[in-house]
Amino acid sequence: MTVRAVRGAVQLDSTDRDAILEATAELVTEVMSRNDLTTDDVISVLFTTTPDLTAEFPALAARKIGFHDVPLMCAAEIAVPGAMPRVVRLMAHIETDRPRSAIQHVYLRGAIALRLDIAQ
């Protein structure tokens, strides 16, 4: 097995707690599904949020869907003028037999505009 990183992001419709939890769960579920992963394959996940998302930690959504013993961390993105608002990003470190070219990076909703080069 090789260690790989998987990227992803989702843009939320609002900044409330439920929106953060729902969108983060959707993003994590899609990353896992598209890359044929189980939580045993995940080494760690780093979540970031844009400065306008303060109602909840995105990691809570991952805990609620089964990431009980996976190290998770949340951080704030820097406030860049003109940056896309209401975005949760993730970078998951995983163990996989897939080559780097076969990793499915997941960008949902409006966040697809962030990485047209790798969004699937």
Pin down the residues of each PLM region.
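Terminal domain-initiation and capping elements
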Residues: 1-120
